[in-house]
Regions:
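A general structural motif
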Residues: 56, 184-194, 215-222, 246-249
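Single conserved hydrophobic/aromatic residue that forms the stacking wall/gate
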Residues: 250-262
Length: 262
């Protein structure tokens, strides 16, 4: 039908659709769509936010159990978790995935040791709440792990940062997350962003990267950050993402206007 989902995509000459998918997702509808012979590309995007969400131990443990079940890897250590995530990363690649996407409040680039991360994993996996410092160290380690995975496969990594979420406690308890009570955050993240990108770049493992800020105050930060890590291997290896969410304004988001900007 003309106004079905597929009909609308054909009507507007869509060539590729990339969905947002968790590492534990089956991707069954991507497989079915491909097998149906649908001419428009339908590709998954790797969104592993829950694998670094260690604020609530019970939620993290429950997610690890899902990851273990879908990957076939028994998880009892940090290395086990990374092995399970790599297996899912491989599966996503087999289904045509070429992009990762990370929804983060800010960039995380704390110093840490392998021993510290192993201990932090054991602590949260065992049900004990982490300190703020431990949370930041774990998130920092996970961003590096994910960045290295993407580089190994030649993927492009995307970072959407700057939202402050679930601000209305009453409505959060009533409706849960992602129900319209998020807003633009204000974070000092330039140094952490630079440190994160620099670590991967120094290791020779910086993947193609797109940076999306939510607070327009960071426009100049990103615009100047891009030039620090271009290496001539491809044009625009590090790019400024288009406006999203509160910045999805028609006067800057139309393709013709984006072409003028570029």
């Amino acid at each position: 039908p003309e106004y079905s989902a597929r009909g609308m995509m054909r009507r507007y000459h869509v060539e590729t659709v990339c969905t947002t998918d968790d590492p534990v997702d089956s991707l069954e509808y991507h497989i079915k769509t491909r097998e149906s012979g649908f001419e428009i590309k339908m590709l998954p995007t790797w969104r592993p936010d829950k694998a670094m969400a260690v604020e609530v131990p019970a939620d993290f443990r429950a997610y690890m159990e899902k990851l273990s079940a879908v990957s076939g890897v028994t998880i009892s250590s940090f290395d086990d978790m990374v092995t399970a995530l790599r297996k899912r990363h491989d599966f996503f690649a087999e289904q045509g995935c070429k992009l990762s996407d990370h929804g983060i409040e800010e960039f995380y680039a704390e110093d840490y040791t392998d021993a510290e991360i192993n201990a932090i994993f054991n602590k949260v996996y065992g049900g004990t709440e982490l300190t703020k410092e431990e949370i930041l160290k774990f998130k920092s380690a996970m961003l590096i792990v994910f960045g290295e995975m993407d580089w190994e496969k030649g993927w492009t990594q995307q970072f959407h940062y700057g939202a402050i979420r679930n601000n209305n406690t009453k409505m959060f308890k009533l409706l849960g997350p992602d129900t319209g009570f998020d807003s633009i955050g204000e974070f000092t993240t330039a140094k952490a962003m630079a440190k994160f990108l620099d670590r991967l770049n120094t290791e020779g493992k910086l993947a193609k990267t797109i940076l999306y800020n939510l607070n327009p105050c960071a426009n100049e930060v990103i615009a100047t950050m891009l030039g620090n890590f271009q290496d001539g291997s491809i044009a625009g290896k590090i790019q400024f993402g288009s406006g999203w969410w509160f910045l999805s304004l028609i006067h800057i988001s139309e393709p013709t206007r984006l072409r003028r900007i570029s």
